[in-house]
């Protein structure tokens, strides 16, 4: 007989406290290193002991007779005692019986019905050596009930399940338990009928429930399985209880079985609202029933119309594309268009390497579907897909093959049709972009030119328009004043330059004089002055014959009343400014500097001024000079100039007819600038 020594309920053999309400976790094994373990460890080397049952024990003693052990659901003479059990198992069965008799005599015996609930303890049991097979999946489609729950109850239960699935605590229960993935191979040894939310939802969809109570039973089964396998105090068990409370709350509003389903009253379509109400009798006078009148469907339910673009230009383009595609798919081309009507199926056609060559497949059927769905925004997009069909054909089928030749033949048909594509520039993209119920689209129907601006009565707009008009007038006035100011400044600048030239005469360095002459020659005159008229009057008779004829032609063009044979009298006051400027800029610009030198402020002649310009005083008065010339240098330069003049006089045709004074004057007038350049250059060299 085994001697059983009672131990305090919350203290183990090592003196450690043990929780009274021990968890029934089915996966917790017995520690093999515990010296108080009474099981034969050599029989269970894999540590596969599990606690399966709880024994009711009191805080002081345990019934020691075999009958008492049987009452507690324990059979056998060997008990396992570890840190979580409330007793130790030692000795023989006879000693246990004697120990129990002594406790009964001392008044310490305890009956089974008086045991406290907090003294529950677990007893070990061996784990199965092989995992149990998985039960058949639910629902069984061959055994569905003939009278499932009504549709309105089914809908309410589905809504309740979907609401529970959205909870955070429902994540572990969404799908069936996978023992392989979760590494729990013996799950089906303890859970004979698994259940989860997706299985309940699937059973609802196929009509596997006859009454709503069966739905609740399956949900409770799922919760109980979790508590049984993980223990009542596990976190996942608490999550199961949370979603159970939420599910029960939803199921409280389950409608009755005979209640009619609630039909949601939708909004009547515009076509139904506009349709007149006509009362019709069931039968006419001859007894024949009338046909039921159904209102037409609303236009907004047609997907084709909703996808139709608002642009009239795009509609015309897609209409032409549809005609081209219809021609390509016509029966008259059936002998060579059939390979391109449908997508290529590499499996049925035994073309396993088709997609290795063709990365973007396309066919005429797909193009037709895209056209019907208005997926093309331009004609170029349609052309690109059609060209892609032929490109794929030529890529996969080499030249000379039958399909390649079919593709070329069909492409010729496409090219001939595509060459007649219309010019869509006449269609405005926003011309027809409106609908009857859309204010913005209706407003775009009218262009800005069709709106009468006189109907605008907003005072702010009118005030801004008045301000804008006044600012435009002020802007024009400011521009005019600025132009007058610029013209006046230019006139003053030209007048000051002329006066400065008259006072300074021909003084100045070579660079300054040459630059001034270059600017005058290159710059055309734009304003008629008195000097221009004087130069034209004095110099026009000195022009060569060819230039004189051209000048006369210019004058005649400005005076259309003069005939070809009439004699032209030059009166500058009768000529317009344009003609005077044309004559001056064409023939007399080069005489401006010489005229200023020949007619100075002192009234002396040009010969006197030219001679004085060659004097030492005149040469020394230049602004830019290296140093004053000596008397010998001045004499030498004068001799050089005289020699040049003599050479020019001897070569000039005027020397035969003109007087010496006239020749000298002409020479001085014609070559004064060159002599000045020589003087200035020599002075700088010195």
Curated annotation (Swiss-Prot):
GO BP annotations listed: chromatin remodeling; DNA repair; negative regulation of heterochromatin formation; positive regulation of double-strand break repair via homologous recombination; regulation of DNA-templated transcription; regulation of silent mating-type cassette heterochromatin formation; snRNA transcription; sporulation resulting in formation of a cellular spore
Q: What happens when the gene is disrupted?
A: Heterochromatin spreading downstream of the silent mating-type locus HMR.
Q: Which residues form the NET domain?
A: 518-598
Q: Where is the composition biased (Basic residues)?
A: 287-296, 488-507
Annotated positions of the Phosphoserine modification: 270, 429, 615, 659
Report the SS bond pairs: none
In what way is this protein post-translationally modified?
Answer: Phosphorylated by the casein kinase CK2 complex.
Q: Which GO-annotated molecular functions does the record name? A: chromatin binding; core promoter sequence-specific DNA binding; histone H4 reader activity; lysine-acetylated histone binding; TFIID-class transcription factor complex binding
Every Bromo domain range? 145-254, 312-421
| Signal sequence extent | none
Q: Name one Pfam family in it.
A: Bromodomain
Localization per record? Nucleus
Q: Which PROSITE patterns does the UniProt entry name for this protein?
A: BROMODOMAIN_1, BROMODOMAIN_2, NET
Q: Mind telling me which Gene3D superfamilies this protein's record contains?
A: 1.20.1270.220, Bromodomain-like (1.20.920.10)
Q: Which family does it belong to?
A: Belongs to the BET family.
Q: How does it assemble?
A: Interacts with the TFIID subunit TAF7 and with acetylated histones H3 and H4.
| Name recorded for this polypeptide | Bromodomain-containing factor 1
Q: Which organism is it from?
A: Saccharomyces cerevisiae (strain ATCC 204508 / S288c)
**The encoding gene:** BDF1
